[in-house]
Amino acid sequence: MSAARESHPHGVKRSASPDDDLGSSNWEAADLGNEERKQKFLRLMGAGKKEHTGRLVIGDHKSTSHFRTGEEDKKINEELESQYQQSMDSKLSGRYRRHCGLGFSEVEDHDGEGDVAGDDDDNDDDSPDPESPDDSESDSESEKEESAEELQAAEHPDEVEDPKNKKDAKSNYKMMFVKSSGS
């Protein structure tokens, strides 16, 4: 151990050239075989620079390097606009969100009474509904009662004159409203 200290005295700077007796840090002199293996070793050690491997460079392909004409731009924009409008129309109409909770299904009357709950199945064409489902729930109860009375009057004009039937229609409507909104 004293021999190693004598060859490198304390406080003296070493020269820039590596010493021959420090073979463990001199990996450049190691015989790795051909140049390819040496490059692989350098790459694995993190010392080698990556070379271009021949893969496609972004923006350097002739199929993607052409520019669209004005007509193509207009056509693409029109298609995107129509798709956007279709999705917004279906979202705002609430056609796909008609369920009110678990186990709830709309009552469909086929015997000619119509929808007492005020659900318009006549407007199932492609035009969007002017009100969203949230807006229709915010209507006052008196307005809904009036609309139910008008529906009953239009469907059964002879029965509306009887006050007992009118009260029954109101109570039926209130019951349907309570069932559909309270889950």
Swiss-Prot record:
PTM sites of type N6-acetyllysine: K174, K179
Biased segments, Acidic residues type: 106-149
Domain of life: Eukaryota
InterPro entries attached to this UniProt entry: SMAP (IPR026714), SMAP_dom (IPR028124)
Keyword Iron carried by entry: no
Chain residue ranges for the region called Disordered: 1-183
Phosphoserine modified-residue sites: S15, S17, S63, S87, S127, S147
Segments of skewed composition (Basic and acidic residues): 48-78, 153-171
Covalent cross-link Glycyl lysine isopeptide (Lys-Gly) (interchain with G-Cter in SUMO2) as placed by the record, residue numbers: K13, K62, K75
UniProt keyword terms in alphabetical order: Acetylation, Isopeptide bond, Phosphoprotein, Ubl conjugation
Family recorded in the similarity comment: Belongs to the SMAP family.
Protein name: Small acidic protein
